[in-house]
Amino acid sequence: MQRKTLLSACIALALSGQGWAADITEVETTTGEKKNTNVTCPADPGKLSPEELKRLPSECSPLVEQNLMPWLSTGAAALITALAVVELNDDDDHHHRNNSPLPPTPPDDESDDTPVPPTPGGDEIIPDDPDDTPTPPKPVSFNNDVILDKTEKTLTIRDSVFTYTENADGTISLQDSNGRKATINLWQIDEANNTVALEGVSADGATKWQYNHNGELVITGDNATVNNNGKTTVDGKDSTGTEINGNNGKVIQDGDLDVSGGGHGIDITGDSATVDNKGTMTVTDPESMGIQIDGDKAIVNNEGESTITNGGTGTQINGDDATANNNGKTTVDGKDSTGTEINGNNGKVIQDGDLDVSGGGHGIDITGDSATVDNKGTMTVTDPESIGIQVDGDQAVVNNEGESAITNGGTGTQINGDDATANNNGKTTVDGKDSTGTEIAGNNGKVIQDGDLDVSGGGHGIDITGDSATVDNKGTMTVTDPESIGIQIDGDQAIVNNEGESTITNGGTGTQINGNDATANNSGKTTVDGKDSTGTKIAGNIGIVNLDGSLTVTGGAHGVENIGDNGTVNNKGDIVVSDTGSIGVLINGEGATVSNTGDVNVSNEATGFSITTNSGKVSLAGSMQVGDFSTGVDLNGNNNSVTLAAKDLKVVGQKATGINVSGDANTVNITGNVLVDKDKTADNAAEYFFDPSVGINVYGSDNNVTLDGKLTVVSDSEVTSRQSNLFDGSAEKTSGLVVIGDGNTVNMNGGLELIGEKNALADGSQVTSLRTGYSYTSVIVVSGESSVYLNGDTTISGEFPLGFAGVIRVQDKALLEIGSGATLTMQDIDSFEHHGTRTLDLPLYFQTSVIT
């Protein structure tokens, strides 16, 4: 039988200041012999020398081991308050429960004996007469949240209350109100600090738990569960609120968790760990961590609000196949601060709550391959070096379904690795220099932008560095301000698909690709306005731009720029270009290819296509209208092939040019219809009446021009009252085809038509008063030592009240040869009157020329 209970001895020791109570009982053996185990051990064996430690009794070895354990060497840290129950037992079916009992302090037994301190020699001290009524002992409170109440026979650890029972082997059994059990094997009292350290096991003996002088709980063994219902505060380096060493460990943090000074709130080492953090979590200071798990297949559920500042880390998981579910709002501020961190492959973070990152912090960091982030909340990132989501590893997938706002140099999503995918379904707003919405560094990166993208202030919406990148932009994209870029890719074989509406203004750039073999497919509506604004830009060889949507360019902007050799631009949509300096499509590089089967409208000093290339190919098969002071196509270079198969190339503006070709050895084939007819109803028609507009200009040497289509020129004559020795009025100057230079060849196989008009201006009084005489309008003008071969049909019709200089003019040694199949038809000429000078009798005009 037990002559003294462990509980009584512990209480006696606690009252007397004894440092350690471990198996302090007198046990009667089977032979009736009493075993005296009343051994006095040093309170702090850590201060003893190695020789002194060797001389200690064997009963003190648990104390020595206990003092050497890491969980007892943490120093004087702040106390943990209000942790709930630690479940250290299994049920009858050996199913692990989700709630639990906790490590306790020595409890009382059923005895009515008053605890009596042992004598130095092991003799007993006889208690007082039992007739005396003893005074009930007061509860003993320790500074690390442990209370021993002998009267109520309870042990309270943190906020968990247990009843206790002594066992025959000297251990103490604990049981909470739900019937869950645990066992205490050892305990130690620190008299100076009034704290108690406890050590025990689960009911089945499989799990070891320790509650140290700092109020820190350490679980060693599999299938352990800790329920922390109260607020937990951890402060100081190496301080830990709850620690589990073993597989399938679980911590349920219902109370708030506050960690600072380099401490750890929850530490679990082992596979398949789970933390349900339902309270508010606050972590601050370098090396501080709210939750740390080292092991595979970990799951952390942060349901409450988390605030991470000044270099702290909210959740860190080191292991493969980890999952972090952040349902609450996460706020991260300060350099080196991190909300959620996973180091391992197949990591996953589900961010249902909002994510707010500033001051250089990181919201989510994953290092490892095949990571996934589902960000369903609103993400706000601001300040340089701040990153909302960062993944370092291959095959990463980031899904941003909520709205993202990135400002002042921050980055929303950054992925460093190959084969990455970012799906941005929500709206993304990026503002400020060095701000980036989504950034990928690696090959085969892909961004699917289903949501709207709004970029300003020099920010970048999407940045990809690496080969074979793809961006599918299906939402609305708005980019404004200098240096702002909606989509930028640095690498070869890039593909960008702009399917939604894009608006680029004030010096911004919609899409920019720097690399070879790039392709940009623009099937949506694109509007570009303002000097230095660019819709799509490729800098690299073999770049391709396909325009299937509509493109509107104004204010000096450029719709498309393709800079590099062997570049291609194919337009099947509508292009509208207006204002000084505006260019619809600019291509510069050797061997360029341009094709247009869409409709192009150019006006107000703009240029539709600006092409600088040698050995290039230009094919215009759609329709084109050229307005005031504008040029439809401006081609500069040698050995180029130009095919004008346009169903309608109309030059209707003042001082306008349909096609301008400058260079040597170019080939121009006109198979479509070309009309030059200045708009006489325009407000500025009279002002620019004498400034010629031209259908096609060819400047240079050894060029070959062939007309197989139809070329029509309309010329107006403004007539006034006849006066002696003065012209009857004035006629405008317009030309269909002008070829200037030596060695050029012009083959006129198609039809030429010159149509005259009379008094087409709304008010031609100012023009007619100048009395310039007959028109110098000609369908064909060739100047220089070149040859013209006329084989087609030529028609003259309409009104020519002042006469005209000729349908074809060849000058400066130009040669005209009229083939046997050529015809000339004069029809529908209502008037051919002239006064004051003699006009030509034939509708051909030669100046220093030869005709055969």
Swiss-Prot record:
Q: Which cysteines are joined by disulfide bonds?
A: none
Q: Compositionally biased, Low complexity: which spans? A: 307-319, 506-516
Q: How far does the signal peptide extend, from start to end residue?
A: 1-21
Cellular component aspect of the GO annotation: extracellular region
Q: Does the keyword Repeat apply?
A: no
Q: Where is this region: Disordered?
A: 30-50, 91-145, 307-354, 407-449, 506-531
Amino acid composition bias (Polar residues), ranges on this chain: 339-348, 517-526
Say yes or no: keyword Secreted present.
yes
Provide the function of this protein.
The full-length protein (which is about 2000 amino acids long) is part of the autotransporter family.
Additional comment:
Missing up to 1200 C-terminal residues compared to orthologs. The gene coding for this protein is interrupted by a hybrid IS2D/IS30C element between amino acids 839 and 840.
Record's protein name: Exported protein YdbA
Q: Which organism is it from?
A: Escherichia coli (strain K12)
